[in-house]
Amino acid sequence: MKANVKVFILSFFLALPIGAQTRFEEKVEEDFWLQSRNISGIREIPFYSARRGISFAELRAGIESGRFHDPSDADLAYGAGVRAGTLVHLPKTSMLGTFSFSERRGDGMCGSMFITPGSYPFDLFEFTPGGKTLQTYAFTGGLAHTLGQAWTIGGKMSFESANYAKKKDIRHTNYRLDLSVEPSVLYRHDDYRLGASLLLRKQSESVSAEQIGSATADSYFAFLDKGLFYGTSQVWNGSGIHLAETGLNRFPVTILSYGGALQASLMEKLCGEVAYIHSEGEAGEKGFTWFRFPENTLSAMVEFRWGGSITQWVRIRYEGRSLSNYETVLDRVTSGGITLPVIYGENRIYRERKDRLSMETEGITHGGSGFLLHLAAARYDRRSFLMFPYYARSREVLADGNFSIWHSFGPWRMTLGANFRTSLFDKDSLEMLPDGGTAAESEPYRLTEWYLPSHEFRLAPRCGLRLAARYNFGKGFYAEGEGSLVRGFRLAYLDGRARIMGGLHFGLEF
C-alpha cells in the first residue's frame, strides 16, 4: 500500500506535459493563421507590447504509471526533454521557430516494433519483453515577408528525427525522418484575406532487427499484421516477415505526400480553410516492394470569433481519410548469377476510411482566466481486410471530449481539466465471399491475444482528471507541477483500469 502511494505521488509530480500552456502555446492555439497551413498569415497576428514578439524555453521531466495502456506500451515509462519557441514581428518580416528534444524510456515492452503503432496499414510485432528507448529531435522554421500593401509571401519547413531501440532479443533499431516544406502566399484587401499554400512532405522509417544471444532463431517469433490483426506468424527471420531477406537487412517504409490548401478571412471574425493531401506510401526498397498504400485526405476548418468582456472563438473541424493497401505478387529471378525482383501484380488486401468532426471553443477574460472546451461530435472508422475467400470488416463510432479551465491570482495560475471517451458503435465480422466456393479454406490467422486488449483500449469508455499549478517567480521565470489520472470502465482484457501521469516544468518566457 505504501509503495502504491509513493508511485502515485511520484507520478503526480513528474511527467509528460498535460497542463498549463505558455503564452507562445496560447497564441498558437487561439490564432487561426497559426492553426492553418499558411505561414504567411503570421503577419496578421497583432501584438500589443513594444517587444513585438513572444518566446519561451523550458526543461521538463515526467513519468507515467499504470496498466491501462495499449499493449505495446510500458507499465512504467519516464522521460525528460527541452523545448523552445519564438514568434517575432519585424517591420516587414515575421518569423516563427520551435525546437524540441525528448527522451522516453519504458521497461518490459514488446509488441509493435514501429515508433508509433498504427501509423501504417500494417505492423510488425515481437514478443520478448525488454527495455525500449525513444529519442526525438524536432524543429520548425517559418518566415513571412510583406510585399507592398497587398501581398505577403512565406514558407515553413518542419523536420523531425527519431531513433528507437530495444536492447533485448529480438533487438531492433528504428530510424524515422519526417521533412515537410510549405510555401504560401496571402492577399490582403480591406477586411478580406485570401491565402493559398502547398505541401511537400517525405516520411521514412526503417526497422532493423538482429539476434545476439545464444538461443536459436527458432526461439523468437514475429508477426506481420496485414490489417485488423490478420497476417503471418513465423520465426522472426522468416521470408513472410520481411525483417531478414536476401539483399535486405531491414524493413523500410517511405511515404511521399503533396497537396494544397486555400484560406479566407473576413474581418478576422470569420475564417476558413480547406485542404487536400495525396500520399503514396510503400514498404520495401531496391525493387523489393511488399506493400503499396496510397491515401487521400480532405480537411476543412471554420472559425467564428467575437470580443467583449470575454474574447471567444468557436472552431469546427472536419477530416476525412481514405486509404488502401496493396500487397504485391513478387518473385526472385536469378540470371547470370544475379537475383532480381519481379513483380507480377498486386492485390488490395486492406481498406480504411476515417471521418472525424470536432468542435472546440475558448473564452479568455481580461483578468487572466479562461476556459477551453473540445468536443469530437463524431469519429467514424471503417476498416476491411481481404484474404480470399474471407472478408473481415470493422466499423466503429467514437465520441470524446475534454474541458479545461484556468485562473490566475497573484503569481499563481491553476488549471483544472477533465476528459472522456466512449464508443457509440462497434461491430467486427469475418465472412466468406459469395464466390468463395464450397470447400472453405482455413480461416486466416489472427493474433487474437493482442487484438482483444488493443481493441478494448481504443474503444473502452474512460474519463480523466488533470490538475496543474504554475508559480511565476518574476522576470519570466516559472515552475510548474502537473498530474493526471485516467480511469477505464467495462474492461475484460486489459491488465489494469487506471494510468497516472505527472510532470515538472522549469522555464522562462521572454
Give the ranges of each region predicted by the language model.
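Outer-membrane beta-barrel channels and translocator barrels
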Residues: 90-93, 146-150, 188-190, 265-269, ...
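Outer-membrane beta-barrel "beta-signal"
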Residues: 23, 187-191, 498-510
